[in-house]
Structure formats: structure tokens, C-alpha cells
């Protein structure tokens, strides 16, 4: 077989393999497509949240309607909800942290003491 025939066979097989396994799509354009899907998900969330009747605060993880953000439940039932008081706020505002693998918030409290 001549060199040009081998090159022709090689490029033909490579073209078939690339088409079959979407090599070029994943290698050159896969990230752009993935980012576009994330924007679509965010717009779907926005559209869904506008249709949920809630006059207070709509929890993003559970879509529960609560009085204030600190009242949101954790998305998973096995999580423990820990409240971290906001130091800058005069009222009882807090940041919610959901912890998995324990039965209480002692680890979060230890980390808070270390950070202050």
C-alpha cells in the first residue's frame, strides 16, 4: 500500500471514530454546551419559583414557604440544621448550615469558636 493510501484509510477511520464518539464535540465544545444547560436550569427555577404562592421567603433547596430564611429546612432528611448567629445584625438573623453525619451541631460550633 502506498503512503497516500494509508493516510486516506487513517483519516477515514479517524473521521468515523470521531463521529461515533463525538470526540470533537466533547473536546472543543463540550464545556460551552454544559454552561448553556446550567443557565437553562436557573431560568427554569426562576419560572417555577414565580408560580409558587409565597408571601414571605421561598427556600431555594426545598421550595418551602417560610417566614424568614433561617426557618428553611435542610434539603435532605438526614441533615442536621445548625444556626450560626450573625454578629453584625441586632435582630435574631442567622446563617443556616446543614450538616450530615452527626446528630448535633457541635462540630459547627467548634469551627465557629476557632474562626472568631
From Swiss-Prot:
Family: Belongs to the LCL2 family.
Purpose of the protein: Probable component of the endoplasmic reticulum-associated degradation (ERAD) pathway.
Protein name according to UniProt: Long chronological lifespan protein 2
One annotated GO biological process: ERAD pathway
Highest taxon of source: Eukaryota
InterPro entries named in the record: LCL2
CDD domains documented for this protein: LCL2-like (cd23996)
Keywords of this entry: Signal
Signal peptide boundaries: 1-19
Amino acid at each position: 500500500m502506498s503512503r497516500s493510501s494509508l493516510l486516506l484509510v487513517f483519516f477515514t477511520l479517524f473521521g468515523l471514530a470521531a463521529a461515533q464518539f463525538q470526540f470533537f464535540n466533547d473536546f472543543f465544545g463540550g464545556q460551552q454546551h454544559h454552561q448553556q444547560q446550567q443557565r437553562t436550569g436557573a431560568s427554569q427555577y426562576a419560572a417555577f419559583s414565580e408560580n409558587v404562592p409565597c408571601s414571605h421567603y421561598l427556600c431555594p433547596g426545598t421550595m418551602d414557604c417560610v417566614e424568614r430564611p433561617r426557618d428553611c429546612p435542610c434539603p435532605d432528611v438526614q441533615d442536621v440544621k445548625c444556626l450560626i448567629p450573625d454578629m453584625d445584625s441586632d435582630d435574631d438573623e442567622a446563617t443556616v448550615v446543614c450538616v450530615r453525619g452527626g446528630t448535633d451541631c457541635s462540630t459547627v460550633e467548634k469551627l465557629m469558636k476557632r474562626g472568631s
